[in-house]
Amino acid sequence: MSITAAQVNELRKATGAGLMDCKKALTETGGDHEKAIDYLRTKGLAAASKKAGRAATEGLVGSYIHAGGKIGVLVEVNCETDFVAKNENFQGFVKDIAMHIAAASPLYVRREEVPAELIEREKAIYREKAKESGKPAAIIEKILDGQINKFFADICLLEQTYVKDPDKTIQTFLNETIASIGENMSIRRFAKFVLGEGLAKKESDFAAEVAAAVGQ
């Protein structure tokens, strides 16, 4: 059966699992919402669902400075208690997220933060490209949905493929960490700084250097 975007979004809101994980769960369970939740729980991807409503107001502002001081990242990750904020696993998660941001250069934490005008501009570009193919309107809209999801996966931190484990997204990594630690967590915001950004300088692929360092 065909799984709709509405079904995926509903399951995502209920469990906090990643979009692709939700789609797979619905596909495996024939579109049954409750069975899909159980499927995600067996995979350890929805263990955070019962914790999702709890306030995460403690946490840590972590940092990562790439070798040579050419790239720097600050990221705020929240948790429920100061006790967990001092936990080595939590602090390790924050460091890993900062390193990922340095390598992958997301622009937003989640898709809800992406300005509507930017989304519409991207849709217009994809729609025009699809029209040139001569495909039916219904097919074009399906292609458009796929292209926009790829767009979000490129620029939204939670939907990016984790640089240290290409088999999972940052959302999945977050869910697994929540399940392991036992508290709700949230990646609130981040900032990335590149030495000399905006100034005339010799070209150098700093992001590739960071990615290589992360993979070590």
UniProtKB/Swiss-Prot annotation:
PROSITE patterns: EF_TS_1, EF_TS_2. GO terms for cellular component: cytoplasm. GO terms for molecular function: translation elongation factor activity. The keyword Cytoplasm applies. Pfam families: EF_TS. The keyword Transferase does not apply. SUPFAM superfamilies: Elongation factor Ts (EF-Ts), dimerisation domain, UBA-like. It is found in: Cytoplasm. It comes from the Bacteria. Disulfide bonds: none annotated. Residues 81-84 are annotated as: Involved in Mg(2+) ion dislocation from EF-Tu. InterPro entries: EF-Ts_dimer_sf (IPR036402), Transl_elong_EFTs/EF1B (IPR001816), Transl_elong_EFTs/EF1B_dimer (IPR014039), Transl_elong_Ts_CS (IPR018101), UBA-like_sf (IPR009060). Keywords: Cytoplasm, Elongation factor, Protein biosynthesis. Associates with the EF-Tu.GDP complex and induces the exchange of GDP to GTP. It remains bound to the aminoacyl-tRNA.EF-Tu.GTP complex up to the GTP hydrolysis stage on the ribosome. HAMAP family: EF_Ts (MF_00050). Belongs to the EF-Ts family. This is Elongation factor Ts. The gene is tsf.
